[in-house]
Amino acid sequence: MDKYLNSFVDHLSEWSSRAFRNNSSSANQSASNKELEQVFEQINAIVENHNNKLTTAFDKISYRVAHKITHLVESHSLVFNYATLVLIASALVVIGSFTSISSIPFTALPPTREHSLFDPTDFDVDHDCHVIYRENDEDKKKKKKSKRFFDMMDEKHAIILPLTSGCTLLALYFVIKKLHLNWLKYVVKILNFNITLLNIPAGTFVYSYFLNSLFRNLSHLASWNPLVVLPRYRVTIADDNEDLNKIGGFVTNLNYKDGLTNSVVHKKTLDEIEKDHWMKHFYRRELVEPKDIKSKRQISNMYLNSALIVSFVLSIVSTVYFYLSPNDWLISNAVSMNMAIWSIAQLKLKNLKSGALILIALFFYDICFVFGTDVMVTVATNLDIPVKLSLPVKFNTAQNNFNFSILGLGDIALPGMFIAMCYKYDIWKWHLDHDDTEFHFLNWSYVGKYFITAMVSYVASLVSAMVSLSIFNTAQPALLYIVPSLLISTILVACWNKDFKQFWNFQYDTIEVDKSLKKAIEKKENSITYSTFILSEYYNDADKYALLGDDVNENFDDDEEFVQEEDLSDSSEEELSEEDLLDDESS
């Protein structure tokens, strides 16, 4: 396989070299190209010198930490290094699984303020589940593009994901092997710039989750008011074309008062302003109660809390530092951790069937590019971008730098999305077994057997990969150990508990029903909310338990019978209405 791959890359390099030679055929063009290269080199030298001055202190910290880690590795062999990698990877998967909850399951009730486990962050997830109608083959042919209310990875991604990943790897391999070193630097800078931009939303998401989770649990344990610890804000942009207030000034509204405000302090502040003539003039508009902002005057609203503000600032700081010093292994690891957690939260598997197919496809993809070729090893070791976890092993005195042991983010994010799906099934199953229970983040009963089984299997498979690496002293595809361990253990537990069929086809926040319901309810939309569905006259207790079972279509064996029953009910209603009219006329 290496032979065919190298020949393919050679053909590409010949074609690119011919193109470069044709573009620079004349002597004037070659001279101008050299001048441009010199200008770019001078600019890069100036920027690098400027960055070195700004990041000298941070580089010293990184080097000191790296030297201490290498000292620990030398004194404890590679056990310390491998154990650290396994611990970090496992922690990222656990955190990513917790952050993947963006809605409540349709088996749960929405959270309420009166519950003992309530926290304001319970309202930060979607409460509306969706009821969608199954489409037959004819409908799928008519609708080439169907609107979806959720973005989940299904069976088709088992083909798309390995193909796109393989094309990306081959493109990077071609850049490393055949293009000039300067071109490789530009490619790395472009990739780092893209990751720098992505780190802003990823870092904000991760840091916000940490702060919200920390203060959520502290407020519950210490019986604090969570709205005092993490107050929530609403920033409204509205037009003032109707009231026409005086322009200028940013003054605190003194009439702001709610249950959290100390009334004594509020009254004391107003008395002090009334006594001071200058202060009274300054707050002259704020002493009068401002008019309410009508909804039709509100241009946009932004909802946030103090944790989100702090997280955004931390994300900006880490992004700027990574931009100034992209080669620092500490900040590179921090950015990689943000990307890993964010990826697990965004990659949502539909059910066990889609997760198993995608992992099996990636299993063969990983083996092909690690054992069959040197593509993955070459790209991972030559591109210094934050798509891997790296820990220093020893200091190379000849090259005056550190040698690192690495673990790709794909070995964290891809199994992580499967483990997150197991965690969602535990939540879904817990509410199914406990009727009429509300969803709350503080409910630690959500950590169930499938999530624990998947995590134990993941840790065991990572340890097996590390042991094989130390024995054979060659790069090991971690998915070779992770995929069989995850699938076999999860499926065995599901079969043992007789949940396999349910787990194989379940959907966390979406209910699929037969299309006959669409005719009965007479809705033109492709989906309705769960709350609307349960309030409809076609939903009774028998239908409720059928929806939670294996197949909804069992209650709708024959569409004609269902329509006939509907017609009979309509006719009976008509007869009743005629009798009522006759009674009214006689009276």
UniProtKB/Swiss-Prot annotation:
Enzyme class: hydrolase
Pfam family of the protein (one): Peptidase_A22B
Domain notes: The PAL motif is required for normal active site conformation.
Chain ranges passing through the membrane: 86-106, 157-177, 193-213, 304-324, 329-349, 352-372, 402-422, 451-471, 476-496
Keyword line: Endoplasmic reticulum, Hydrolase, Membrane, Protease, Transmembrane, Transmembrane helix
Enzyme Commission number, as recorded: 3.4.23.-
GO molecular function, one term: aspartic endopeptidase activity, intramembrane cleaving
Residue segments, region Disordered: 561-587
Organism: Saccharomyces cerevisiae (strain ATCC 204508 / S288c)
Highest classification ranks of the organism: Eukaryota, Fungi, Dikarya, Ascomycota, Saccharomycotina
Membrane topology type: Multi-pass membrane protein
Residues annotated as the enzyme's active site: D366, D411
GO cellular component terms, semicolon-separated: cytoplasmic side of endoplasmic reticulum membrane; lumenal side of endoplasmic reticulum membrane; perinuclear endoplasmic reticulum membrane
Keyword Hydrolase in record: yes
Domain of life where this protein originates: Eukaryota
Motif (PAL): 477-479
Subcellular location(s) per record: Membrane; Endoplasmic reticulum membrane
Family annotation (InterPro entries): Peptidase_A22B_SPP, Preselin/SPP
Protein name, per record: Probable intramembrane protease YKL100C
Predominant cellular place of this UniProt entry's protein: membrane
